[in-house]
């Protein structure tokens, strides 16, 4: 028996979910069974209770549920997120090649099934933006895994900077702000970005 609260949706919501749309809007939810807190995982089901997907819930948002999986066998532990990160990074390295891999978008939100998360890489600096509460609550684990995987791939990462200075976070019930992520990686502000610009300028000559 699954442990997640059930969110029953309208026929419109069902069609959207079956079509691969990753969002369930508030007006598409008709009934809720079970207890939950904002940021928790919940199951999305049809009016007859048939499983459609699992995602992060947030009552503060117009996007009530952000779906992360449509597989009932998935266990959403650290190993799950590590596999998903590895897949996204391996894909970019394969498609873009080593040279472009050092300056690109590593994680692109719903496209990589990390709803509301963007991660850009500029040489040895990562810049992130988190726009969903479910990811926000798990970002410590995700960022540490991301850095670990990149280092295992032979990529040097010295800093991770959070650019969360966007108003949409307020609509999601989160605070705005920008700062270095709390690890021992953080360089002096400005030092890395200056180096990035110089390196990219040299590459273009």
List where the protein language model places each region.
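Non-catalytic accessory regions of SAM-dependent methyltransferases
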Residues: 1-123, 181, 190-192
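Short helix/loop capping segments that flank catalytic or ligand/cofactor-binding pockets
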Residues: 33, 53, 137-138, 205
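Structural motif
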Residues: 42, 125-126, 158-160
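Short, charged, low-complexity patches
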Residues: 78, 135-139, 143
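Non-catalytic substrate-recognition/targeting regions of SAM-dependent transferases
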Residues: 109-114, 118-120, 140-205
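A short interface-forming secondary-structure element
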Residues: 123-136
């Amino acid at each position: 028996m699954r442990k997640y609260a059930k969110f029953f949706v309208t026929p419109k919501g069902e069609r959207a979910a079956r079509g691969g749309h990753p969002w369930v809007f508030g007006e598409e939810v008709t009934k809720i069974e079970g207890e939950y807190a904002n940021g928790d995982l919940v199951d999305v089901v049809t009016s007859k209770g048939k499983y459609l997907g699992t995602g992060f819930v947030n009552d503060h948002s117009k996007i009530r549920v952000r779906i992360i999986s449509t597989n009932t066998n998935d266990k959403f532990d650290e190993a799950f997120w590590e596999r998903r990160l590895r897949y996204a990074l391996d894909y970019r390295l394969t498609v873009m090649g080593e040279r472009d891999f050092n300056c690109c978008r590593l994680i692109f939100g719903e496209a990589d099934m990390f709803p509301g998360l963007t991660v850009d890489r500029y040489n040895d600096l990562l810049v992130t933006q988190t726009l969903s509460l479910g990811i926000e609550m798990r970002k410590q684990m995700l960022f540490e895994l991301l850095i670990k995987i990149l280092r295992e791939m032979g990529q040097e990462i010295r800093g991770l900077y959070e650019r969360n200075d966007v108003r949409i976070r307020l609509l999601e019930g989160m605070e705005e702000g920008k700062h270095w992520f709390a690890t021992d990686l953080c360089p002096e502000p400005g030092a890395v970005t200056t180096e990035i610009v110089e390196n990219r300028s040299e590459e273009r000559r």
